[in-house]
């Protein structure tokens, strides 16, 4: 049976809450400690404490280490992980993937290259311990699947190295693009950049738990006390049922459909608006010809987006078209698990996309821009380029 984890993030998610919950599921503290020491952090000590939040027990994590002022770059952290002798390759890969998620967000919000990004809070020893510790724990649990509830960010303002900012912090907001958010009016930072990166990297879908048989439940505690609810993260370890396993590669999320009927725009104007909408973060944009009242020909402009982009996209539609009203529909979406992949063709590396079908088989498709690029460079037909790319993918 396929083992899975489901994260219930009613009070948000952070690195220490995640690590505490995974340890509460039964992962050995000594195993995590041994792996952390091999990061060339011999003075680091991981301690656990059983606490109560609103009357419920949970595991709270403490990271003890000498004070430091170092601001590390991503390549420094990657090197630390690569050189760790007591961490499995799969745990190393997961930890580096989580750090990359944070690094890409930091690069975007600060307007610099990934290599020049230097980590502040996330580069501190306790955050390194949280992320690497979580990766070690996930590897120890041997889970192949994870899902999560929608994510609350909290509200209000916090002070970081760059000054006072609104919640969620800029990096957190960037990481959570495309992730369904939970409505929340608690004035506190519930989800940190570390927690956001962990859940975005791990979770295949956001919403209710899948059909599964629960095996164990772990609770990780946050440091603050919240009014009216326990500041804990609940993580359930279970086995997917047969029906759920057969759909294990199908992800689900919530998206919003914005639509407007426009009868006084040219084809060029609508094409330009579509490009602007995609650049502003729409998941997809399409146009449908319709006949309106009085027999007028018109076009329905449809925009698919996640909740975080609704405001920006509807503002763009109101300012860039003549529409005076929009329809908004919330809907569930199912999609195959996918990831970017580069294959080595006879004409050099080419970027494509791999999706995993419900029966577990993989399907590869070359990006159309890559097809055009290779056709222009080689004079080959598009069919030949695609055939060679498929052969390269099949050869591994």
Swiss-Prot record:
For the region Disordered, give the residue spans: 333-355
Pfam families recorded: Ni_insertion (PF01969)
Which UniProt keyword terms apply here? Nickel
Please name the GO terms that the record assigns under molecular function: lyase activity; nickel cation binding
Asked whether the UniProt record includes Transport among its keywords, one would answer no
Q: Which InterPro entries match?
A: Ni_insertion (IPR002822)
Organism superkingdom: Bacteria
UniProt family annotation = Belongs to the LarC family.
Protein name, as recorded: Putative nickel insertion protein
User: What is the originating organism of this protein?
Assistant: Rhodopirellula baltica (strain DSM 10527 / NCIMB 13988 / SH1)
